[in-house]
Amino acid sequence: MTSRSQKLRNKTTLSVAIIWIGSLWLSISANTQPLLQGLVAQELFVEPHSTDSCSISMTEVSYPYTQLSAALFHPTQKNKLPPMTQTLQVICSVTVSQMTMEVVSDTQASSVTDADPTHFGLGHVNGQGSLGYYQVKLDEAKIGSDAVQLYHTADENAVGTLQSSLFLQSSGYQGWAKEGGSPASGQQFSVNMTVLPTLSSLKETHGPLVDGANLNGELVLRFPFSI
C-alpha cells in the first residue's frame, strides 16, 4: 500500500488558463504557446522529479454573442445568458491513481457581489459596479469511455460525496471517482464544462452602461494528479 508521504512525493500538477474576454467571447485553449492576440494561453507545470506527465487535449473554441446590447441589463433583475458547453480532456502518459481539479485564481473575484463559492466574476463597470458572474457546471465525467462520478472535497487526498454533476467551486478540489467512493484511475480523464453567465441588474452595475463594457473574467485551473 502506498503511504501518504509517497503519494505527496508523487503529486504533479497541470495547469490551464480559461479566459472570458472582450465582447462576450469565451476562448479556451490548450495551446502551450501564447496566442498572437493574447486571448488565452495554457501552461504545463511538471515537477522536476517526475518524468511522467499529463496534457490537456482541447480545441480552442470562441463563443460570440452577436446580439449583446445594453438592453440585456435590466433595472432590478439579473439576466441569464445562454449556457455554453465544451468537453475538457486530460491525457496522461501513464496510468494515474487520482486526478483532481482546483481553481487557482479568479482575476475578477472582486466583481462578485455575494459569497457563493460557485460564482466567478465577469469584471467591473462604472467604477466598482459589477457586470455579473458565471458558474461552471461539470458533468458527463468519464475515464476513457467509461462513465464515472464527480465529487468535491476540501482535502485532495479524500473523496467527497459522489455526484453525477456539480458546480466548480473557488476552494477545494473536484475529482473523478468510481462507484463505492474510491478515486478513479486511468490515463484519459474527461468532463463537460458548461459556462452559465448571469448579468447584473443596473442597480449592481451602478447605472446604465453609457460607455459600454466588456465581460472580462479569467479562471486559472490546476489539475493535481497522483502516479
Feature-to-residue mapping (PLM):
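Bacterial N-terminal signal peptides
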Residues: 15-25
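Mature extracellular/passenger domains of Gram-negative fimbrial/pilin and adhesin proteins
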Residues: 2-5, 30-227
